[in-house]
């Protein structure tokens, strides 16, 4: 399904609302724009990642006193996410440390990851999966800031 109608988008937004919108998550307008874009795959999501020095798990989480770094916490999420991406026909295209910004404004990015999905439906199927959602606690604990650019490969 390349194009989502308003009712389908509203249902999905209600489903995902429990995790929150904005900050390190897309806001409702961004997610609605993606779903209603009519774009279909393959699509590459370019993830710019900046980590907390120390992971910020909720107090009641078993890993709260663990002393994990933000990057280590995000790595736990990354393992879960990659499994879900691959199961849906996607792939990890690139995963690199950022060394410096050579041109442009300095940004706080620590790493870049590019995930390729066969289409928007594969991405939506993943983010609806309860097992994937259970891994979001590690993403939330590790990420200080992020930007995700949705792109279409030209080559």
Task: Show where each model-derived region lies.
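Short S/T/G/P-rich N-terminal loop/turn motif that feeds into the first structured element of a domain
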Residues: 1-110, 118, 122, 152-155
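Short amphipathic alpha-helices in soluble, non-transmembrane regions
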Residues: 126-131
